[in-house]
Amino acid sequence: QKKSAWVSQVTLYGYLKTRMGAKYVLMFEDEIFLGSINKAKWNIYSVALQDLTFYAISFLKNIRNQHDTEKANEIYFQILDNELQKNEMPNEIYENAKKKFLERYQNINWNEYHESLPFNTSALSLYEWSPIAEELKSLDKKIVLNSMILKWDNVKKEFICLLYTSD
């Protein structure tokens, strides 16, 4: 949960800061823009959380022979419910995240997910939801996607290291 929030927020705010330059601080006084950032933040985070949940369960299933893939539902919905109740995740985003999670869950290949661009969906979500003009975003697509993927690579390394040091 914390890693998903960290990756999504660091990449979103980093992208905004890079794109806006000196105006970055001033934009936080604009209520409309703040609303856009909040909407983007929650949408990106909900997908990042899906990616990390699916990655962890797929990895454990294949590397540790743990076959309880239903745990993905329990983990994701427990965290999402907590975000709704304690952190004021917007209800519309909450409902949409649940729906998208279930769609992805039904179609996931647990044997391959952890090895087949497991964080691509959240990187695309960062690109889609960032409140940046489309003509500028199109110039940044590769950089934006790579920035998130590189952060996820660090999370994957930490996860694997934790698993093997706990043996």
Language model region names:
Residues Q1-Y24:
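Leu/Val/Ala/Ile-rich N-terminal alpha-helices, chiefly Sec-type signal peptides and the beginnings
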Residues H67-D81, I149-D153:
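Amphipathic alpha-helical scaffolding segments
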Residues K2, W6, K39-S46, E70, ...:
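Alpha-solenoid helical-repeat scaffolds
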Residues Y164-D167:
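Conserved small/polar residues in nucleotide/adenosyl-binding loops
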Residues F77-M148:
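Polybasic, proline/glycine-rich intrinsically disordered low-complexity segments
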Residues I57-A72, Q85-I93:
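Short, solvent-exposed secondary-structure capping/transition elements
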